[in-house]
Amino acid sequence: MDSNTITSFQVDCYLWHIRKLLSMRDMCDAPFDDRLRRDQKALKGRGSTLGLDLRVATMEGKKIVEDILKSETDENLKIAIASSPAPRYITDMSIEEISREWYMLMPRQKITGGLMVKMDQAIMDKRIILKANFSVLFDQLETLVSLRAFTEDGAIVAEISPIPSMPGHSTEDVKNAIGILIGGLEWNDNSIRASENIQRFAWGIRDEDGGPPLPPKQKRYMARRVESEV
């Protein structure tokens, strides 16, 4: 196993522990707690994949961080902060919406680009809106936390979420996953609309009816992929 992979995991475990302490002392906001829960699942998945104990990894990560801080100067910190752009956190969904349990009568799912696409194929003739929580860097979607599809009465009928045990995803991965989700839902004559944030930061444009600018041919192609590959 690559030593850098192990070191990265150990440091991530310790930094998560520090963030958890802040949360326990009520020193963070809702997006911070949201990311904390998601990252906990991701660390458990990575730990299982690597065969490493989280508690032991956290202690080793503490040693690594302490060694780095001993040699770090305030001037180096200032330079690093000044040269690193900070991502913004976009929230279409409330904590209740992003954490609510939901169930599928006719479950379908597909893995694409480190993302899991889930949808209920029993949903028909509904008006559906896509909402997402994600980080933005350089005015473009950087990391998806969660995307969910809601009916007009608030029922959750589909979801896209990162797979904890897999490496990160790109903006193109997210766009492809959304295309698969839209294609699958539109197959049953549902009307899909993406939130303004998804339109702006995933595609960078908006079309006239407020839906994501996905050509009909691509939607049909994505729908066929759902039928044949899921």
Curated annotation (Swiss-Prot):
Give a GO biological-process term: symbiont-mediated suppression of host cytoplasmic pattern recognition receptor signaling pathway via inhibition of RIG-I activity
List cellular component terms (GO).
host cell cytoplasm; host cell nucleus
- Molecular function GO terms recorded: protein serine/threonine kinase inhibitor activity; RNA binding
Enumerate the residue ranges of region (RNA-binding and homodimerization). 1-73
What SUPFAM superfamilies does this protein's entry cite? Answer: Ns1 effector domain-like, S15/NS1 RNA-binding domain
- Major localisation: host cell
Q: Show the segment(s) annotated as Disordered.
A: 208-230
Localization in the cell: Host nucleus; Host cytoplasm
Motif Nuclear export signal: which residue numbers? 137-146
- Extract the ranges annotated as region (PABPN1-binding): 223-230
Q: Which Pfam families match?
A: Flu_NS1 (PF00600)
Q: Where is this motif: Nuclear localization signal?
A: 34-38
Q: Residues annotated as region CPSF4-binding?
A: 180-215
Keyword terms, alphabetized: Eukaryotic host gene expression shutoff by virus, Host cytoplasm, Host gene expression shutoff by virus, Host mRNA suppression by virus, Host nucleus, Host-virus interaction, Inhibition of host innate immune response by virus, Inhibition of host interferon signaling pathway by virus, Inhibition of host PKR by virus, Inhibition of host pre-mRNA processing by virus, Inhibition of host RIG-I by virus, Inhibition of host RLR pathway by virus, Interferon antiviral system evasion, RNA-binding, Ubl conjugation, Viral immunoevasion
Q: How is it modified after translation?
A: Upon interferon induction, ISGylated via host HERC5; this results in the impairment of NS1 interaction with RNA targets due to its inability to form homodimers and to interact with host EIF2AK2/PKR.
Tell me the subunit arrangement: Homodimer. Interacts with host TRIM25 (via coiled coil); this interaction specifically inhibits TRIM25 multimerization and TRIM25-mediated RIGI CARD ubiquitination. Interacts with human EIF2AK2/PKR, CPSF4, IVNS1ABP and PABPN1.
| Role | Inhibits post-transcriptional processing of cellular pre-mRNA, by binding and inhibiting two cellular proteins that are required for the 3'-end processing of cellular pre-mRNAs: the 30 kDa cleavage and polyadenylation specificity factor/CPSF4 and the poly(A)-binding protein 2/PABPN1. In turn, unprocessed 3' end pre-mRNAs accumulate in the host nucleus and are no longer exported to the cytoplasm. Cellular protein synthesis is thereby shut off very early after virus infection.
UniProt lists the family membership as follows:
Belongs to the influenza A viruses NS1 family.
Q: What is known of its domains?
A: The dsRNA-binding region is required for suppression of RNA silencing.
Listed name of the protein: Non-structural protein 1
The species this protein was found in: Influenza A virus (strain A/Tern/Turkmenia/18/1972 H3N3)
